[in-house]
Amino acid sequence: MSYHIYTSRGIVLSERPMREADRIYTVMTRDLGLVRALATGVRKEPSKLRGNIEPFSLSAVSFVKGREYWRLTSAELIQRISSAPAMARPLALLEKLIQGESSNPELFSAVEEAVLSTEPYNEIFEANMVSKILFHLGYLKKSDMTLDKKDLIIAINNGLQASHL
């Protein structure tokens, strides 16, 4: 039996242990959307995936569809992402807001651009990143993106309130 291998760039949002040596990773991909993938044996020392697929990393990842979960078959680290609070909070919000496996290339591009940027990770960076996430998910209007910082934060809070989180 042959399996189709899906390869895409992905931002690893989180991981959780499963069994003795396995982990389930939550990865936002350009082509597949939000994917929960099982990496078998990744916690063992000789694992080929170890180090290439860690939370807060941008990686080229390959999956095959399993019965319960996607299975992670390979990963190649592109860049580590800062775990500074101004970066970690928007990525955690992203994981909460995206439901299911629906592709959203515009959202992925906006998040990838923020992740790869050299801007300092401060309150303004965080507010801009959250506003882009909420805009691409339909919680903010285009006109909200040009507001000053105080009004932008009010618009973000209204968007979050609309999401019922």
Model-derived features with residue positions:
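Non-catalytic alpha-helical scaffolds and adjoining flexible linkers that form interface surfaces
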Residues: 1-23, 28-58, 62-165
